[in-house]
Amino acid sequence: MEEHIPLPSQYESPKALPPRVPSSRWLRSLRPRLANSCLALKIRAHESLVKIRLCKPYDAQSRSKIIEKVIERRETRKTLAHQLKDLKLVPVARDHTHGRAAKFRTSANIWMNEAMRAAGYEPYNVSMSNHDIERGNRYFYFAKDLTIPYRNDPVSDNTGFVFCDVDYYADMEKWMQHFKPMLLYTLVPESLSYHCDDHSFHVNDDRVFFDVRGGASYSHQLWDYTGDTICVRGKNKELLVFTIEQKCIQGDPHRRIIFLEPAARVAWPFYKPMKVEVGLKRKCMTAGQVNVLYEPIDDKISLSASGSRHTVETTGRTLAAITARMKNKTSPPMVADVERILRDAGDKEACVNAPILFELIPEAKFRVNVVKTTATPTHFQPLGPLRTEDGETCGHAVTTTLATAPALLPMRGVNSDVATVNGRVKKPANTVIPFKEYKEYASEFVEFLVPEPGVGHPWDTAAVREVQDNRQQKARINMVAATVSTHSSNRLKAFIKAEAYAATNDPRNITTMAPELTLMMSCFTYAFKEKILYEQPWYGPGKTPKQVGRRLQSIAKHGTLESDYSRFDGSISEWLQKNVVKAAYMRFFKEHQRTEFQSWFSKVFMQMGTTTAGVRYEAGWGTRSGSPITTDGNTMLNAFVVYCCYRKLCHTPAEAWRKLSQGALLTGDDAVLAHENGLEPALLDVVKNLGLKVEAKVNGPDDPVSFCGRIYPRLSDCITSFQDPLRTIPKLHLTTNKGVSPEQAAANRAHGYLATDKATPIIGTWARRVIELTGDLKVKGATREEQYKLSNAHQQLDPSLIETAMANILGIDVGELKALDKAVSEAKALDQMPVVLGNCYKHKIEAVVGGEVVGPGPRVETVEPNHEQSSGTPEVVPEMAGHSERRDKSSNPRPGGKAEGLSSKAGKPRVPTRPAADRKAAAGSGNRRGPTNGRRPIRDRAPRGGGRPNPGTTPPVSNSETTTTTAVVHASA
């Protein structure tokens, strides 16, 4: 029986009490406590002194030495980690509604309990199921929990906790305060959504929504077990450190076995100076309106929109590339930008993922189109394999359009590249091997062209550098100057040429060469050009505008024949390249230099090429538009065709060469020939035999002549010329110069046209007015085309002749032309240019223009809406060019040219006139005119022949958002 020791009375002396001797065990436990308390007091005192700056904080060594005295470590891993072997699946009932999920869950539960027992611990199942036989607890959270009895077993010193798919609902920090080993079977998603046979889940707002077939739906947050350690505070504020070990489960990629091992315990406040992140946090998977899940080891990222069950999986590197692309685009970002990068990254579902990902990139939502001058469509997007592609713009408008059907620029992208390859490379590809006689013609032509064989010597690279003196050429040469050799390789890289088209068409491609090849092969081509081609009277490149005019004058004395080839570059055959172009160069150079040229030539015509969008294609034998032999090769081939024509007319070789030398001017695929009987059918026959396509037009001695986009109205008197207005006016407002401001780009373009067409109505006036409206800006950052115009001014000595010829082309009177010209000169701003040309589209391919799909098809006559000024009062300009009602049969024929609506026969006007009945009906519709101020309104006119629509044309694109200073008023047809 325990002896009762009465407490001493307050009146009794303490000395009278028998002394109580502490046990040795208690003293041993008290000693470290006292030591720790003293050490803690010392640390707190030191902290106080640090605050008042009487001493310095502990350095890392001193702090670590103090912590080592009080730290408590566990060696749990050595016993438990070795039990974590592969998970073996146990069978479940065949009729289980979600057998797969149940199999993994049950197998994991059994496996974790066995691992705990094998390591010597007593398993403690948190939120235990009805199958668990070990110790544990069971509380009620959901209605389903009520089917199993309540349970709350005590935690012993030898407990090991087991969490089987329940840690989401548990207060894990409180359980970790027990400082016991933990095994968890939990959801660690690798993507934001998952679907399988019996269950699925998706993430939204940092919560997982889990659906089980034949079962319930759950939603919960996840704990973030990222990293290698987790720290929590114990009940006495001590620091509890757990290490994390994760084991992936084969067959269930979104589930893991996680081992939380108690590793170290440090009392308060010894760990206070350490930089320790304390607490277990919930997994964060939502940023704003986007759900994001990133796995840094595999660089996998999963994204979805808030509230969406559908995700996009890609790599972090790919997403970074897409984001950078969006940030640095000068034009509005497009879905195709994303799709293109995904395709290149190997995403087989790029077409589906691109639109979803595009909406998830924040940068894509804040970019807008910077073109402010007009809402008129400026680009067309060919229909192609990328259904969601929007393409990249290659230019923009600097003023409002002057035409009802403005010219269009091609978008850049996969669809445009495919259209280019199909329309400019594959479709016109020429495999024709002509008759034997053409082999003889080729030999004769080459011998006349290069009379002395083996005398040529290539330039050195220094001479090439002096000639190629523009900034881009210099940069290209400097880039390879140190590494170039005679054995350099080549690569074909094609890109879409930034040029405007009268309607949708297969974009032209420029096939660039490796800089090394361009430099080394130019040594040969410049030498050949200097010694051979410049000596030929028919060779047009390099001639000044005055020399071109004089040459045309000498040719046109008895009439001319103009030829217009179709897809000339793409239709050149291997036979033509080898028997004409290559043969001429090889004959010119010395024998020991021919091997090198042949090597460069073969590299130019390597057969595989790649577009800028990554489209691979077989390049065939068509002219490489970016090679050193492009212009010279095409001009020689053009000359060879003409030589064959004269041989077909039974001229001797010498006579054929003489006629070519005396009666032709050729530049690339442009040709003007002195006319003679039988020449036109001979041309058509030769072209057919060589596998080419051409349209020919015969002009009389006094007829206008068109060459390289310029019209020479009366060569019998003067060499005055002007730009073809039907080609030029629709594209005046467009520029491809993105390196300068819109105002500077407009000024550059205007200065170029002012140099070539200062006396041309509308065109020259537009240029002068733009320069005035831009504050007389000087040329800065001009394109190569603009620089060429500035340095090649054409003679315009007879302005009245230009007015008469241009009015005839446009189908209006000179007085009406002057009125249109005046309207342009009175434009109040760049975005208030008047519409002066009534043209229409003749689309050649299906494409998207202004959000609508257009393409070849019958023309439908429409009445365009009025475009009112900001004041609300429509201004009616004079009769719009191309809409005349007063052309009669006695009118002078319009000058030649290659624009739409031009006749292919000499002596006939090319602008169709309106039938008398239609003119009479239109004259009676005075109620449609509005205020005219004595000037006639602009009317849409019917084509010749009873007003029936022209097949193959479509109406002008009408855009109600276009800002103009004039109202286009149409009378009923």
Curated annotation (Swiss-Prot):
For RdRP activity. It comes from Pariacoto virus (PaV). Its cofactor is Mn(2+). CDD domains: ps-ssRNAv_Nodaviridae_RdRp. It is an enzyme of class 2 (transferase). It comes from the Viruses. The lineage of its organism: Viruses, Riboviria, Orthornavirae, Kitrinoviricota, Magsaviricetes. One of its GO terms (molecular function) is RNA binding. This is RNA-directed RNA polymerase. GO terms for biological process: DNA-templated transcription; viral RNA genome replication. Residues 853-973 are annotated as: Disordered. Keywords: Host membrane, Host mitochondrion, Host mitochondrion outer membrane, Membrane, Nucleotide-binding, Nucleotidyltransferase, RNA-directed RNA polymerase, Transferase, Viral RNA replication. The active site is at residue 669. GO terms for cellular component: host cell mitochondrial outer membrane; membrane. Residues 924-935, 955-973 have a biased composition (Low complexity). The N-terminus is important for both membrane association and mitochondrial localization. It may also contain a RNA methyltransferase (MTase-GTase) capping domain. The C-terminus contains the RNA-dependent RNA polymerase domain and a structurally disordered region at the very end. The viral bipartite genome is composed of RNA1 and RNA2. Its main location: host cell. PROSITE patterns: RDRP_SSRNA_POS. The keyword Oxidoreductase does not apply. It is found in: Host mitochondrion outer membrane. Residues 96-264 are annotated as: Capping.
